[in-house]
UniProtKB/Swiss-Prot annotation:
GO terms for molecular function: DNA binding; excinuclease ABC activity. Residues 204-239 form the UVR domain. Belongs to the UvrC family. InterPro entries: GIY-YIG_endonuc, GIY-YIG_endonuc_sf, GIY-YIG_UvrC_Cho, Hlx-hairpin-Hlx_DNA-bd_motif, RuvA_2-like, UVR_dom, UVR_dom_sf, UvrABC_protein_C. One of its GO terms (biological process) is nucleotide-excision repair. It comes from Pseudomonas paraeruginosa (strain DSM 24068 / PA7) (Pseudomonas aeruginosa (strain PA7)). Residues 16-94 form the GIY-YIG domain. Interacts with UvrB in an incision complex. One of its GO terms (cellular component) is excinuclease repair complex. SUPFAM superfamilies: C-terminal UvrC-binding domain of UvrB (SSF46600), GIY-YIG endonuclease (SSF82771), RuvA domain 2-like (SSF47781). This is UvrABC system protein C. It is found in: Cytoplasm.
């Protein structure tokens, strides 16, 4: 355990409720994410004096900070834990090689006869997504039972479009045969509507509707239809949503604001169909004397009015009221075309949701204030190391990433005394320079950044940190001189001969002013943190750009294959690798590809 982390003091304030915890080292690097039925009991087990496994002991000695997020139950803790592990890939977590996200049910919207399917990954296709579900097995069971109940197709689009007679699913009464016109669009749409009602968590309303239909069918002496509806109701009862918050329903956002002399936090929980889909913390900049109601009013206005694409719930549950909420509701109704109800005095499940949001806001703000003091101390140490009159308020760091000159990307990350300012991060796609020329790439990125600054866009940094040593530092000086930018400090950082962390060489303003800092210096830790973040941000941008180029560049050489057809081909075959393996006949079977065009595509893909 590090000297700066007081486990006893932390555990004394830790909650006994379910949740997720995140462990960080002295450089604010995320080490481990875990979940617990009782956060206090689980975290206490890490700090026993004996009996720890070697891996756990190795983790504990590096812990400098622990953050927690309270959840309503263990299932929500599991989903949040998985999300964090996927996003950050902490070194002490077990990382699955396929790194798949939790699955969703996807309902296509572009087809006359929509399809239900299991979906993982980015939500790029047009349609509706329901979930997440805790496992693929759970979602397949639900899809299987939904198919039995409502007979909505689940086959691949390519399979569906090429059928000339019903498949086995029709024979075993799992599908109504829309592929060959055995069911009309109106009847099929009704089956889809029932499926959506179930997936939205409106099982009770759906069961009531089906029960009514069953009674009406029985009165008409249509006992076959009545039996069909009876079976559908029975299936619904078997697959009631296990993730629903008990007693909850509808679409609700729960928003709680907390203000202390050190700052403010707004915690938002999104509930759709009675299921918690996720939550997020926001930390608005506020004056010390700001009232909680004012903070909440400003947040709600910006969140729902400034971002029209955000899903608007039917109701907001808040932890404090404001006299101007009716005005806000009217403004939202006018801008979004939907009525919104704001509730404060709530009972039962809704009161528990409200308290959960308040608790998470308090926990998050407390953790942020502790971390802010940690980062601010590093800024003060940097000011002392550079002999500055006062700590800097804005640091910018640039880095370059490419693969042998391919898909070069420059990154700019920004830090302040409160930590990373991610809304100010920028990436620059580098064009028109010699492949692999990092100096030219840096020149272009800095020129673009500071040209905009000269035009009045953005803020001037106090310190410009350049990764790469003397050469890149000289390039930065050249750009600043060309643009007549003055008043900022240049700091170059170069890895030492051994390239080990802690042995970096620093250059202040010019290559002649060379110095080093002790490996345990908080100022050096801040520089390392910002440099590593710039590298991470650059390499993720580079990989995305390189991947996109490699997926499409080969097909761009084929006459008659434009962007849409390239996209359709890659989607049909599942990627460039599978496309390259396809024969001419297989290519010709793809939508919109003639035999002649298939031959041209095959020739280009196998030209080397």
């Amino acid at each position: 355990m590090t000297a700066v982390f007081d486990a006893s003091a932390f555990l004394a304030t830790c909650s006994n409720r379910p949740g997720v915890y995140r462990m960080f080292d002295a450089d604010a690097k995320l080490l481990y994410v875990g979940k617990a039925k009782s956060l206090k009991k689980r975290l206490a087990s890490y700090f026993r004096k004996s009996g720890l496994a070697p891996k756990t002991a190795a983790l504990v000695v590096r812990i400098a900070q622990v953050e927690t997020t309270i959840t309503a139950n263990e299932t929500e803790a599991l989903l949040l834990e998985q999300t964090l592990i996927k996003e950050w890939r902490p070194p002490y977590n077990i990382l699955l090689r396929d790194d798949k996200s939790y699955p969703f049910v996807f309902l296509s919207s572009e087809d006359e006869y929509p399809r239900l399917s299991l979906h993982r990954g980015a939500k790029k296709r047009k349609g509706r997504y329901f979930g997440p579900y805790p496992s693929a097995g759970a979602i397949r069971e639900s899809l299987n039972l939904l198919q039995k109940a409502f007979l909505v197709r689940q086959c691949e689009d390519s399979y569906f479009r090429n059928r000339t007679r019903p498949c086995l699913q029709y024979q075993i009464k799992r599908c109504k045969g829309p592929c060959v016109g055995l069911v009309g669009p109106e009847e099929y749409a009704e089956d889809v509507r029932h499926s959506v009602m179930f997936l939205e968590g409106r099982s009770n309303a759906l069961a009531d509707e089906l029960n009514t239909g069953m009674e009406q069918a029985a009165m008409r002496l249509d006992f076959e239809k009545a039996a069909e509806l009876r079976d559908q109701v029975a299936i619904l009862r078997r697959v009631q949503d296990q993730q629903s918050m008990e007693g909850g329903n509808g679409d609700v956002d729960i928003v709680a604001a907390i203000v202390t002399p050190g700052g403010a936090c707004v915690h938002l929980i999104s509930v759709r169909g009675g299921r918690v889909l996720g939550s997020k913390n926001f930390f608005p900049q506020v004056a010390i004397e700001e009232e909680v109601g004012e903070v909440l009013l400003a947040f709600l206005g910006q969140y729902y009015l400034s971002h029209q694409e955000r899903d608007l719930p039917a109701e907001l549950i808040v932890n404090v009221m404001h006299e101007d909420f009716p005005v806000l509701v009217a403004a939202i109704a006018e801008a979004r075309g939907r009525q919104l109800e704001i509730s404060y005095r709530v009972r039962g499940t809704r009161a528990r949701w409200q308290q959960l949001a308040v608790t998470n806001a308090e926990q998050a703000l407390g953790a942020r204030l502790a971390n802010r003091q940690h980062v601010a101390a590093r800024f003060e140490a940097l000011a002392e190391a550079l002999d500055l009159a006062e700590p800097p308020q804005r640091l910018e760091c640039f880095d370059i990433s490419h693969s042998s000159g391919e898909a070069t990307v420059a990154s700019c990350v920004v830090f302040g005394p409160e930590g990373p300012l991610k809304s100010d991060y920028r990436r620059y796609n580098i064009e028109g320079v010699t492949a692999g020329d990092d100096y030219a790439a840096m020149h272009q990125a800095l020129t673009r950044r500071f040209s905009r600054l000269k035009e009045g866009e953005g803020k001037m940094p106090d310190i410009l940190l350049v990764d790469g040593g003397k050469g890149q530092l000289a390039m930065a000086q050249e750009v600043l001189q060309e643009l007549a930018v003055a008043g900022l400090i240049l700091l170059g950082v170069a890895k030492g001969v051994t390239r080990k962390p802690g042995l970096e060489t620093l250059y202040l303003n010019d290559a002649a002013h060379e110095f080093t800092l002790p490996a345990d210096s908080p100022a050096l830790h801040l520089i390392q943190q910002i440099r590593d973040e710039a590298h991470r941000f650059a390499i993720t941008g580079h990989r995305a750009r390189r991947g996109k180029a490699r997926r499409t560049s080969t097909l761009e050489d084929v006459p008659g294959v434009g962007p849409k057809r390239r996209r359709d081909l890659l989607k049909h075959f599942g990627g460039l690798q599978e496309l390259s393996r396809a024969s001419i006949d297989e290519l010709a079977k793809a939508p919109g590809i003639s035999k002649k065009l298939a031959e041209q595509i095959y020739a280009v893909l196998h030209s080397e």
